[in-house]
């Protein structure tokens, strides 16, 4: 079962919660409220999305968490983003089919001046059992409080959570930019993207192996940007992936 997590310290979460209307309260667990949007549990959390540390509560209500969050960037522009969280070298469990379905639903609803992107794995929380997907609106106060933008996110999410998930080749990306250049492959339904190991982190065999393991489904394809992954680590990573039966696509 899916779980939507809204954080009262986050402006996009607050706008999202308001747009959902009156949600029946199911129960209270400490400082968490568990409400319901039709058949989907909605966990209301008082802190920041990146500070969420109540995975034990999530385990009792579902398996796949979707965090509603604001997006910030150095050069702000209107954008919808999707990504799996993780503070390297550890990461959360990634759900490639879910994350890519949400990306497609958002991109299909784009309107000017917004764009859409799939981001590299970054920031906490790091989940151990529950898959985590961040869905974000960026990148300034104007967009965070924009009811049309947040409503677009809500519509896209409802479409995905209330429909059977399409399943395309599960893939991870190694050594790409923060805003992955592989997004178009996901939009064309050639792959479903899980973890993206960005070029700016220390890319070690151990970190890649952890990311490979922490997916809801076995990864069938790894897209590796060889210029951004230096030897001897690159050779060890390639061997590890091939030993596990993962198809490797080299770029750059």
Swiss-Prot record:
The gene is dtdA. Keywords: Hydrolase, Metal-binding, Zinc. This is D-aminoacyl-tRNA deacylase. Its cofactor is Zn(2+). It comes from the Archaea. InterPro entries: Deacylase_DtdA_archaea (IPR018033), DtdA (IPR007508). HAMAP family: Deacylase_DtdA (MF_00562). Monomer. GO terms for biological process: D-amino acid catabolic process. Its EC number is 3.1.1.96. Coiled coil: none annotated. It catalyses: a D-aminoacyl-tRNA + H2O = a tRNA + a D-alpha-amino acid + H(+); glycyl-tRNA(Ala) + H2O = tRNA(Ala) + glycine + H(+). D-aminoacyl-tRNA deacylase with broad substrate specificity. By recycling D-aminoacyl-tRNA to D-amino acids and free tRNA molecules, this enzyme counteracts the toxicity associated with the formation of D-aminoacyl-tRNA entities in vivo. It comes from Pyrobaculum arsenaticum (strain DSM 13514 / JCM 11321 / PZ6).
């Amino acid at each position: 079962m899916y779980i939507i997590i809204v954080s009262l310290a986050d402006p996009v979460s607050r706008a999202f919660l308001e747009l959902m209307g009156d949600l029946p309260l199911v129960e209270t667990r400490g400082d968490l409220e568990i409400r319901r949007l039709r058949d989907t549990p909605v966990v209301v959390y008082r802190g920041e999305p990146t500070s969420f540390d109540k995975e034990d509560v999530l385990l009792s209500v579902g398996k796949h968490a979707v965090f509603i969050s604001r997006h910030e960037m150095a050069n702000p522009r209107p954008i919808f983003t999707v990504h799996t969280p993780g503070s390297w070298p550890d990461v959360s469990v990634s759900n490639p089919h879910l994350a890519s379905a949400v990306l497609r639903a958002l991109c299909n609803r784009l309107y000017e001046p917004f764009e859409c992107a799939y981001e590299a794995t970054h920031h906490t929380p790091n989940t151990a059992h529950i898959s985590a997907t961040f869905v974000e609106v960026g990148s300034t106060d104007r967009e965070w409080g924009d009811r049309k933008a947040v409503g677009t996110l809500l519509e896209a999410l409802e479409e995905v959570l209330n429909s059977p998930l399409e399943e395309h080749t599960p893939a991870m990306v190694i050594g790409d930019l923060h805003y992955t250049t592989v997004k178009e492959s996901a939009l064309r339904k050639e792959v479903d993207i899980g973890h993206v190991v960005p070029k700016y982190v220390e890319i070690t065999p151990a970190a890649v192996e952890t990311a490979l393991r922490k997916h809801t489904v076995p990864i069938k394809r790894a897209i590796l940007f060889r210029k951004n992954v230096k030897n001897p680590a690159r050779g060890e990573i390639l061997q590890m992936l091939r030993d596990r039966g993962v198809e490797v696509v080299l770029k750059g």
